[in-house]
Structure formats: structure tokens, C-alpha cells
Amino acid sequence: MEVENSRKRQLDSRPQQHLVNGGSPSKRPRLSNGYESTNGADAATDPMELDNHGDNNHAYPSPLEGEQAPTPTPRTDGPEQGTQVDKVQELATETTFLRLMPDDTTSTASNPQDGAAATTTAATGAASPSPANGENAPILLRCEWNPKDPSILAAAGTDALARIWTISRSSTMTPAPDSESDGHVHGVHRPYHSLMDDETPKSATVGQLAWNWGGTAIAIAAEYGDKASIHIWAKDGSHVDKFDVSDPPVIKLRWSPSDAALLAIAPDNSNGNGNGGALVTVYHSLTSATLSYFLPNHDLLNWPLDAAWTSETEFLLTGGDVMLSLRCTDTAILPNRKFESRDDDTFTQVAYDWRSKLAATSSDKGILDLWDENGQRRSITAHSGAITALQWQPLPADSSPPEDERLIATGGDDCAILIWNAKFPDQKPKSYFTMESPIVAVSFTPDGAFIAGATAGHILIWKVGEHTMPRASWSRAPHPGWLSPKANSEPEEEDEHCLCWDADGQRLAYGANSRLAVINFSR
């Protein structure tokens, strides 16, 4: 009982930003999707059956226009080619589930003298979907593919979960000898590098991780009791550096554009009353020098801060009614500019686009704001509820996009995903998609050609510019393939969801609670 209470305290102490950026709001009305089926969701019997709904003509309306999302229609490619009906690719059979439980019987300890992480190889025997110690399965909080190497995936969470796997595309299609597998879903044990040193207790929570832009190193933030630390590891699992943090938890990690500095946001309780404010620290990875900026009297619990680098020395800081530009000198972090905010602003996320020099902020009131270099602000009422996801469309470095177009996607509690042209924010969205429940994450492929949207139990993938019908669909359902088993006391509601593409845009990682799926996608 004490162990379980400790785990609950770990989760309850996490900052509430997770509820905004990746939350799964409870008791939302389940609304129809533009991708319809004649089978009701409640009647699903196949383990990976689509979370479809009946043909009820209740597609969720556009937040701006009040129109129904179009149902799938025939697509005409030309008068001589005739009419073709697009087929949605079902990804259930292209799924691998990674085990998150520690394999104590086969793991090898780290060597503290050479700083190398432990390499753990799971047993080759059949895996039980519900082992005796399943109730202690870690809760997944973060997952992220290496931005340059499509075979490397990292994950972090409670119970000292911090590891990286090397997973080739072909290996994800090799099923484990699970007697309960139906042949459609592959549960696998994969060797991994643990990113925890011997000094970190097994009860630690790793709440943040971030690959650098070059994919050569990964930073993680671990907390245990009243202590916290940031570790930097090379992608081969060797330890590079460590920074102690005065007060846990670290709620954000952001690498600078050249990977020379790492920004971290954490509370500051040095005044002893528990509400001192927020501390922004920049660690220089090459020199181990640190710079700090204190934001007094900021309620970090209710209004978590987010940050985005705009150059190698400048970054934006936002959260609640705060919108600041800060600048790093050789000796300090100094205010660069304070943007004009309103009393009712409730900023939750910030994302900067170096191509257009525009910064985008989202709010829990559904407002998307676009800020130019001069601090001019243009606001869009994007959603009827909180914006839960925000991402600029990535483009290949050598591409030449149209001068009059720069796309950004938002997802919201209102079950809608919209793609906007930031160059013309007064216009209607370029595309909008709807799903059956609140959006918990959106993710563009690295080349910007496709976008995935996720709810708590369903993923749809669209080709950007084609919003009539999704290209692919994946649904989550109870199945032995979730090798990290559901704990008896694990809550049905989930605060954390991970969704990200590999560097090639051919595999999605999707995580929730104690489960992590790798989903193959064929373009």
C-alpha cells in the first residue's frame, strides 16, 4: 500500500501543464468522426478494431463555421481515370508494443567508473501479459524519437523509467513468442540502454526528456524526494554530464539551436514558503557554466511556463499572463522585451518558427496568437475549448515554400484539429479534421507531408492538403500486446499521452499510462 501511495504522490506532484499539453479530459461528449463506419464503437470485438461510430450524421462541426465535417467521398483523378474511392489504411497489424517493465533478472549494472549506462536484454522466453509484479509497472510520461536516427527511441516516466531502444524497422515486425498473441499485434522485448545512474533511486520520476537537434545527446530530468537533477547522455548510452537542480520538478527542457546550451524551468522555493516563483536556468554543455533568471511570485503549479529559443542567445518565456523575451549574456540572463499581454491571457504553449520569424502561443481559452518580431499580435479564436496541441509544419531545409504560406496546426478539447496559414491569420483554416473525443496530441512527419492526430484511444493520419479522408487509422483496445500490464489501481483517466514520428516519418510512437506502441506507416 505504501508503495502505491508513493507512486500516486509522484504523479500528483507533477505540474499541471501535462493536463494542458497532453491531457485526456474526462467526461467529454463522444462526437462522431469524419471517417465513419457502420459498426458502433461499443460493439468492437477485435482487439485492434477501429474506434468507429455508427452512421449517425453527427460529425463534429468546424469551430469557426458550424459546418459538418465532410464524410468520405469518392475522389476523381480525371475523366479518363474514372472515380476511385480512397481506402483508409488500417495499422493494427503494423504495431509493436515495447515492454516498459524492468527486467531485473537479466539487467547488468552500470559501471560508475566508465559512466556507461546499463544495457538490458530481456529474456527470450514467452512474456506473460500480466506478470505478478504488474501493479508496479512504470507510468510513461515522455517518449521521443532521435531526430536524426530513425532507429532510436527514448522513453521516460515513473519508477526510474529512462531508456533508449535501438529498433530497426524490420525488427518491429518480428513477433515475440507470446502464446496469447493473435498474430496481428506484436509484443516484443528489445535490448535497451538505461539512462539512470546507480545513485538515482528506483522511486525516481523522470518527468522530462529532450534530444538535442543533432541527435547526438539526450537530456533527462529526474526527481526523487526533494532532490532533482538533469543528466545528459550520448545516444550510445554513455553518460556525459550532470547538473543538480535546487527544487523539483523540472517542467521543461529546451536545447538551443546549436545544441550548445540547455534551458530548464523549475520552481524556486528558496524563500521557504513554497510559492517563491519560477527559476529559468541555462546550462552550457561545453563549459558547464550556468545562468539563471528568477521570475518572482509566478504560480508555476497553475500556470506552468513554456519556452522557445529564437536565436542562440535569446528565448521566449510564456505561461499564464507572462510573455517575455529574454537574452543570455556571458554572465546573466536579462529581459530583452516584455510583450503587451491582457489581463485575461492564459498562455499555455509557445512555438517559434525561424522561417517566418513568427512566434505562436496557445491558450486554455482556445485562442491562437501570432507574434511578429516587433511584438505585434494577431489573435485567432481557433477552438471552442482549450488548445491542447500546437506545432509548426516542419519543412525540409532545402525546400522553397511559397512566400505567402506558413502552416501551423492546433488541436483542442473540442475534438478538432485545424491547420492555419500564419501569413493570413484572418482567413479561415486551410484544413480542419475532427475526431471522436478531445485531441491529446498532433504530430507532423519531419518532412511536413503528413499529420497525425491522437485522442486517448485513436489515431488518424492525413496527408497535408487532403482533408476529405484520412490515409490511415489506428485504434487502441485491451490486448495482451500491451506487455506492460495495467495495474490493478491504475486510473482509467490518463494525464499523459505521447505521440511522435521517427526521423523518416515511417513510424509513430504512441504512449499512454504503462504502454508504448510503435506503429509502422506505409506512405
Regions found by a protein language model. Name each.
Residues 1-144, 151, 163, 168-196, ...:
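Intrinsically disordered, low-complexity acidic/Ser/Thr/Pro-rich linker and tail segments
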Residues 90-93, 125-126, 164-196, 224-242, ...:
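Per-blade loop-tip surfaces of WD-repeat and WD-like beta-propellers in eukaryotic adaptors/scaffolds
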Residues 138-144, 202-210, 248-255, 300-308, ...:
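Canonical WD40 repeat/beta-propeller blade segments in eukaryotic WD-repeat proteins
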Residues 150-154, 215-221, 240-241, 260-265, ...:
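Structural hallmark of WD40 beta-propellers
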Residues 156-159, 221-226, 266-269, 275-276, ...:
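Conserved strand-to-loop turn within each blade of WD40 beta-propeller repeats
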Residues 187-191, 197-214:
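Helix-rich alpha-solenoid scaffolding regions
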Residues 437-465:
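Loop/turn-rich, solvent-exposed surfaces of beta-rich toroidal or solenoidal domains
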Residues 495-523:
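Blade-level signature of beta-propeller repeat domains, shared across WD40, Kelch, NHL, RCC1
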